[in-house]
């Protein structure tokens, strides 16, 4: 059987976030995500279609992924008589006697002042705002969207709003850089590549960690390197590309372009008839890479764990061609933000609720600790939005 509980989810998230989470926010999420999910997919709720895995899981994938969920929710909102103003960013909170009573917004050449009994801030994070991202993260590649500028953080400046975990931004390993300069997760590709005998080496041509270890530990090891490269034979490379193209991250036409000798942009993807030729293109010491390959293959043949605790599922071919992709650490979702209470109200630095002001989604700080736990950011978007809407509905009904 499969046993789970809100209490277990809380402890798992606290452990994953290295106890840097705001426990009250984690408990709020764990205790309401079930009800929020039922509303999201239920016929008497939002009725958003989703993919069923057929096995116990904490994760959920809406049809059409995030865009599909947003499209369905927008259609439901408008069908219920709601008005959705796109390309109309809020610029300022309307505050009277310390209470938030509306927002000012601009869009389509028109200025709006919208008064309301309550305002929900759901403007996302600040990963794209260099002024808010701590310097230690800027050496990594940004992988978020351009709109994550932390607008709400500026909007609450005059309200003495409490901000928590503003020094934390989510980082993840297994990333490449796209031609646009943005980071891109490679999880769909690396899973198949590692099963076919792929491994990573650093700038010295040496393996440095168990590539199949958990993301946090792998990332700490990557931070010690100047660079790292995923080394693949033909089978591993085919598996990698299958995962990435099936996820519509890039096309095989892109790969052909990136592998050409006259391509000098991102990503750094190279091909060699032998490991030595591949290393020459990457300015890596061939003898070190060849030694790494031999040690890896010896463990694969004996089905024993290597120095880093990995038992290779398959050896790397001794015949070319061979391929390499430079791998990076990426950052995207911000983990800090507004401090809320269990009614989704934004708190001030005295831990008092700011009248009329609520928050949901990534603009809220403290859920994740210092690293994101799979599926919980989308889960929090749903749960916190559901909770905030219910809280505001109760206020409006009074």
Regions found by a protein language model. Name each.
Residues 1-83, 198-200, 204-207, 235-237, ...:
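Conserved N-terminal/central alpha/beta ligand/cofactor-binding core
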Residues 193-195, 332-334, 374:
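Short, small/polar residue-rich loop motifs at catalytic or cofactor-binding pockets
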Residues 153-155, 162-284:
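An anion/pyrophosphate-binding glycine-rich loop and adjacent beta-alpha core
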Residues 152-162, 285, 290, 380-398:
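Internal hydrophobic alpha-helix adjacent to the cofactor/substrate pocket in enzyme cavities
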Residues 1-2, 184-185, 376:
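Conserved N-terminal glycine-rich FAD pyrophosphate-binding loop of Rossmann-like flavoproteins
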Residues 63-117, 153-159, 338-339:
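Helical element adjacent to the flavin cofactor pocket in flavoenzyme catalytic cores
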Residues 107, 114-179, 378, 387:
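Glycine-rich loop(s) and the adjacent beta-strand/alpha-helix scaffold that form part
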Residues 92, 288-371:
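A glycine-rich dinucleotide-binding beta-alpha-beta segment and adjacent secondary-structure elements
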């Amino acid at each position: 059987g499969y046993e789970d509980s809100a209490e277990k989810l809380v402890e798992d998230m606290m452990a994953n976030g290295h106890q840097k989470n705001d426990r009250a926010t984690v408990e709020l999420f764990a205790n309401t995500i079930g009800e929020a999910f039922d509303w999201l997919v239920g016929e008497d709720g939002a009725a958003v279609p989703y993919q069923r895995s057929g096995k116990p899981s904490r994760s959920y994938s809406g049809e059409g992924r995030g865009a599909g969920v947003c499209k369905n929710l927008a259609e439901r909102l408008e069908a219920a008589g709601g008005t959705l103003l796109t390309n109309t960013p809020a610029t300022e909170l309307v505050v009277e006697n310390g209470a938030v009573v509306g927002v000012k917004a601009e869009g389509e050449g028109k200025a709006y002042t919208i008064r309301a009994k309550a305002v929900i801030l759901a403007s996302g994070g600040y990963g794209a705002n260099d002024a808010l991202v701590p310097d230690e993260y800027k050496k990594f590649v940004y992988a978020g969207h351009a709109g994550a500028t932390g607008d709400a953080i500026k909007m609450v400046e005059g309200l003495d709003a409490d901000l928590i975990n503003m020094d934390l931004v989510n980082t993840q390993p297994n990333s490449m850089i796209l031609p646009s300069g943005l980071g891109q997760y490679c999880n769909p590709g690396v899973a198949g590549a590692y099963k076919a005998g792929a491994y990573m080496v650093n700038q010295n041509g040496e393996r440095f960690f168990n590539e199949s270890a958990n993301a946090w530990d792998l990332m700490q090891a990557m931070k010690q390197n100047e660079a790292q490269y995923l080394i693949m034979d033909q089978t591993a490379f085919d598996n990698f590309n299958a995962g990435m193209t099936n996820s519509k991250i890039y096309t095989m036409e892109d790969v052909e372009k990136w592998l050409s000798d006259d391509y000098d942009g991102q990503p750094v993807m190279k091909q060699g008839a032998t490991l030595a030729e591949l290393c020459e293109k990457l300015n890596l010491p061939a003898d070190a890479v060849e030694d790494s390959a031999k040690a890896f293959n010896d463990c694969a043949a004996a089905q024993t764990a290597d120095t880093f605790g990995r038992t290779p599922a398959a050896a790397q071919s001794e015949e070319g061609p061979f391929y390499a992709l430079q791998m990076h650490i990426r950052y995207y979702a911000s983990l800090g933000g507004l401090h809320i209470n269990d009614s989704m109200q934004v708190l001030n630095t005295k831990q008092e609720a700011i009248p009329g002001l609520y928050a949901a989604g990534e603009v809220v700080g403290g859920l994740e600790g210092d690293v994101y736990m799979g599926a919980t950011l989308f889960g929090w978007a749903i749960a916190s939005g559901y909770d905030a809407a219910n809280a505001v509905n109760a206020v409006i009904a009074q």
